[in-house]
Amino acid sequence: GEWSALETLTHVRDVIVHVYGLRLRRLFYEHEPVFADFDEEAYRPASLARGESVEYLLDTIVGEHEQLARLLEAVPDAEWAREGRHPQFGIMSIEFLARRVGEHAEEHAAQITAAARAR
């Protein structure tokens, strides 16, 4: 079924912090890192059990986006092509992951709004 607004916000936070944020930081500091898979189904129950508020989740999501934006602004043009590898999804560059950060948030924004209205 559909996730609630809280479940969706928790997912968005987990992905920005533990997937895209971590992978981007590894690309900034490592040569051709190999990225681990993110088992969302295993991670989500523990993440939801923390009982974080909507406000806390939003603050974390916004803060992580702002921090990544500052880090990305400092990346020289030639470095945007730096790559790491995911065992299942293949090559991922800084540019690809930076785009996914924004796309992922946009993909879930309408879902969060609809879930909040349906409450």
Model-predicted regions and their roles:
Residues 1-40, 66-69, 73, 83-119:
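Short, contiguous alpha-helical
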Residues 41-81:
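Acidic/histidine-rich alpha-helical segments that form the ligand environment
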